[in-house]
UniProtKB/Swiss-Prot annotation:
Pathway membership: Cofactor biosynthesis; ubiquinone biosynthesis
UniProt topology in membrane: Peripheral membrane protein
Binding positions (Fe cation 1): E57, E87, H90, E171
Protein name, UniProt field: 3-demethoxyubiquinol 3-hydroxylase
Length: 208
């Protein structure tokens, strides 16, 4: 059973890095009028932001995989799996949007994935309450990060905006689930370290 689980997660990891994701929900579409034409500068900026979001979803897959593998609770395994499936939708959506913008995912995705997997294992080994607290804090920081992107995206890029808005709604839900399941609040130094690591990732992934 454990071996089968490892094989499944290994396959998911390879697909995350390679950009071959399974979409269980369709790409969110803007409710309003047809998308407007973006200038070259707007397309470049939108692509940079969506590349950052794609990297975030690569990391989310690694984190949830690690947390799922390190918990002995069947209920938490199911919760992490459900969140990972929704995050895989995000991965597929952002990859789809990058292609529409004639851009590409980060060249450093294997590095981001490996780092997030290691962090997830450490969080999981510290116990379920810490692991859930880490999940809740991660989702809070992602929510804030997506709020920033919603204000930065070109006004005409309603397609990217629709994707980010649905991603944000899902992240809020995941964070609440982690808190409701018993996640503790992480100490301030840990939260600050997470923000610093996120800053390095986002500033690098925008370009690479």
């Amino acid at each position: 059973m454990v071996f089968d689980e490892l094989i499944t997660e290994f396959d998911r990891g390879l697909r995350s890095i390679a950009g071959v994701s399974r979409m269980s929900r369709p790409v969110p579409k803007p409710a309003a009028a047809a998308p407007a034409e973006l200038s070259a500068a707007e397309r470049k900026h939108a692509a940079g932001l969506m590349r950052v979001n794609h990297v975030g979803e690569v990391c989310a897959q690694a984190l949830y995989q690690a947390q799922k593998l390190t918990t002995s609770s069947a209920g938490l395994k199911e919760m992490f799996e459900h969140a990972a499936r929704e995050e895989e939708d995000h991965l597929a959506w952002t990859a789809h949007r990058l292609k529409d913008l004639d851009s590409r995912p980060s060249l450093l995705n294997p590095l981001w994935y490996a780092g997030a997997l290691a962090i997830g294992v450490v969080a999981g080994r510290l116990g379920d309450k810490v692991s859930l607290g880490f999940m809740a804090e991660t989702e809070r920081q992602v929510e804030s990060h997506l709020d920033g992107h919603l204000s930065e995206l070109p006004a005409a890029d309603v397609e990217s905006r629709a994707i980010v808005e649905q991603m944000r709604a899902d992240e809020v839900k995941h964070g609440k689930s982690a808190t409701d399941a018993g996640g503790i609040e992480l100490p301030m130094p840990a939260r600050m370290l997470m923000r610093a690591a996120s800053k390095v990732m986002t500033s690098t992934a925008y370009y690479l």
